[in-house]
């Protein structure tokens, strides 16, 4: 491979990192308080939830890329691989939020309510009267579910794009998958640091921090891309 053949994979890796970082800001993460239904969102950490969706997206993308007749040099096939990643991630996170919601509503007996908005931007439902005193919301309201689904789609797209770039660099499918997982984690952790705790979704004031996180991932992914190209060249 000559130097010019590395430009496209480097650009794809850099863009993928920025997309992954942006996706994490959409995911409704309530952390440990949400596990006790005292905070809005899913009861786990930012990185874990985003990475879970991203891994599923990577598996879906890898499955599509391995199909007979699929070529990474074909733009239509690349789009199909990326869409497969997006759909896989959306299914994973959608089911996670759905099962969590069932437990919150029927197991704990709370009404899903967002603390960071007066009305749900999607349904227009008033939120504050339904928030239990002493909590910062609970459950997964409609706006959080929609935001999480968008985040999962972006995460799946970013992860799939990184996988495509790694295969274009000549890495075997298994190695490309391992490297893509590590790459996804790197950007998810950067986003987690940028958020600084919990986030409800695109309606949360912390969502405004996203540009800083995207810039950080853009730079770090560019450096990571250069390292990966060096690995592909055998340096």
From Swiss-Prot:
InterPro entries named in the record: MeTrfase_D (IPR005779)
Any one cellular-component term (Gene Ontology): vesicle membrane
Enzyme class: translocase
Enzyme Commission designation: 7.2.1.4
Reaction it catalyzes: 5-methyl-5,6,7,8-tetrahydromethanopterin + coenzyme M + 2 Na(+)(in) = 5,6,7,8-tetrahydromethanopterin + methyl-coenzyme M + 2 Na(+)(out)
Places the protein is found: Cell membrane
Transmembrane segments: 15-37, 49-71, 86-108, 143-165, 169-191, 212-234
BP-aspect Gene Ontology terms: methanogenesis, from carbon dioxide; methylation; one-carbon metabolic process
Keywords linked to the UniProt accession: Cell membrane, Membrane, Methanogenesis, Methyltransferase, One-carbon metabolism, Transferase, Translocase, Transmembrane, Transmembrane helix
Molecular functions (GO terms): tetrahydromethanopterin S-methyltransferase activity
Mode of membrane association: Multi-pass membrane protein
Pathway per the UniProt entry: One-carbon metabolism; methanogenesis from CO(2); methyl-coenzyme M from 5,10-methylene-5,6,7,8-tetrahydromethanopterin: step 2/2
Keyword Transferase: yes
Subunit structure: The complex is composed of 8 subunits; MtrA, MtrB, MtrC, MtrD, MtrE, MtrF, MtrG and MtrH.
Family: Belongs to the MtrD family.
NCBIfam families: mtrD
Role this protein plays: Part of a complex that catalyzes the formation of methyl-coenzyme M and tetrahydromethanopterin from coenzyme M and methyl-tetrahydromethanopterin. This is an energy-conserving, sodium-ion translocating step.
Protein's UniProt name: Tetrahydromethanopterin S-methyltransferase subunit D
Organism ancestry: Archaea, Methanobacteriati, Methanobacteriota, Methanomada group, Methanococci
Gene name per UniProt: mtrD
